[in-house]
């Protein structure tokens, strides 16, 4: 038995408390206390349901020098995540039931965050032949995506949506038009021109979202089941407007935004620092503000990290040669708690929802609330501030564009079904 005493409760339904949360047999037994072997003083802290990340690259199999299941899932629980969806763009890609099962079994044995593998939409993520979605779902895949690559063939995407619909699997898309994106390394515009860097235009995202929404309309018309499209790492004002319009029209589309697109802009590239190189690129302030509005009005369903670790040697190459990607599993919530909630008054209830029930809805999972009988997958968060120290990361990617930023809202206790998997109470 574990008792978390005198703690404020925050979930998608609101804030309340203080409460004395008694945990046993993997569940919340009471919000009014009781006898327990381990007592945690939650004074000044708040308790939330465990977070779910819809989008993380754990690099296993094939690139374990960058990250592996142990380091990635340990980073996850340190960040308050009890559940995580791993992307399939590994070496080789996760495109078979055997590969999905192998990941799930290894992750389960580690006893950290629960892994929910995404499987490739097409074999080898080549965009040609669809993978066996039914068998992948039976093996434990929770969505289909060729993330890391763009879906250039609209017919293949349509067939994938039609295949996934009766299985209840969402199809997630990296929405960029490859012909427009080309070799861009930052947002296309006056700053890219000034710096002499190739630009990736916002129209590349908007054009692909517009096309994919039309493909979704077709699949919806042709399928007796409901196809579900999920737009990954949305980064532009126009892309957001397209998703908003589609939702108002009743299309079954969901979307996510990342911590980096919510807190950073293209201005970070003025120093040519490759730590800020990411795909899609950091955009302008107008785009960032639009994303924040999208979080509030429900256009965006979830905050997803797009945790993308590389070796420091790779990220220290010049901006043209360094790989795309930012690691953020361990800082995502403190970053947004500080930058959005504390500094801008963003509602804490809504912020927690974007880390919990929002991503759960994308996957078709039931909500997880703080109530008697609920699964005790929980995170205790402290408002105490401290600077981001990448040298202390569990992730193998021990660097960060937010290094030195002073943040509050750090996870100090993470439980998965009643088991403590991370503790930093002192």
Swiss-Prot record:
Keyword Transmembrane: no
Top class in the EC scheme: hydrolase
CDD domains in the record: DHOase_IIa
GO annotation terms (biological process): 'de novo' UMP biosynthetic process; purine nucleobase catabolic process
Molecular function, one GO term: dihydroorotase activity
Annotated binding of Zn(2+) 1, by residue: 55, 57, 147, 306
Record's catalysed reaction(s): (S)-dihydroorotate + H2O = N-carbamoyl-L-aspartate + H(+)
A cellular-component GO term for this protein: cytoplasm
A Pfam family it matches: Amidohydro_1
Keywords: Hydrolase, Metal-binding, Pyrimidine biosynthesis, Zinc
Active site: 306
Free-text remark on how the cofactor is bound: Binds 2 Zn(2+) ions per subunit.
Cofactors: Zn(2+)
Pathway(s) this gene product operates in, as recorded in its UniProt entry: Pyrimidine metabolism; UMP biosynthesis via de novo pathway; (S)-dihydroorotate from bicarbonate: step 3/3
Keyword presence, Lipid metabolism: no
Residues annotated as binding Zn(2+) 2: 147, 174, 233
Residues the entry annotates as binding substrate: 57-59, 89, 310, 324-325
EC annotation from Swiss-Prot or TrEMBL: 3.5.2.3
Alphabetical list of PROSITE patterns matching this protein: DIHYDROOROTASE_1, DIHYDROOROTASE_2
Protein family according to the UniProt entry: Belongs to the metallo-dependent hydrolases superfamily. DHOase family. Class I DHOase subfamily.
Task of the protein: Catalyzes the reversible cyclization of carbamoyl aspartate to dihydroorotate.
Protein name per UniProt: Dihydroorotase
Species this protein is from: Thermus thermophilus (strain ATCC 27634 / DSM 579 / HB8)
Gene field: pyrC
